[in-house]
């Protein structure tokens, strides 16, 4: 029997989430999964969006932020290692794109991500992860939209 769960004010049915994978779960792939599953995907999530590269986060140029209306409910996953940049990006994404949630990635084990202190690399620096979550949550709470924050993480580093 398919079950549901609640994410703040959103009833998600069924209780399935298409796991975001960089280079795989782009908008056409997510749309295909939604259609071929017969709408048995409760949530779809973007590929992770980098936040560290720009001096000021810009929505343009991030193909990961493209999504189709039928992908809703839809979340945007962000990654980085700088709390202020992640918070600014989350607020800009929330206020301009209105996803159902923002997700912080603390789970990617790829050396090019974790090795630079992002993704699962944050699990080696829990005070930084705590600061990121605090700052992103504060930014979302101060935004003009009501969007929850979620976290993708691993059980541990080792």
Predicted segments, located by residue:
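Glycine-rich, proline-tolerant flexible connector loops at the mouths of alpha/beta enzymes
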Residues: 50-55, 106-126
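Generic N-terminal amphipathic, Lys/Arg-enriched alpha-helix
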Residues: 9, 13-15
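Glycine-rich, positively charged N-terminal anion/phosphate-binding segment
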Residues: 2-6, 21-96
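A contiguous, low-structure linker/loop signature
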Residues: 89-112
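Alpha-helix-loop-beta-strand connector modules within alpha/beta enzyme cores
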Residues: 65-73, 122-150
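Hydrophobic faces of well-ordered beta-strands that scaffold small-molecule active sites
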Residues: 16-19, 44-47, 74-78, 102-104, ...
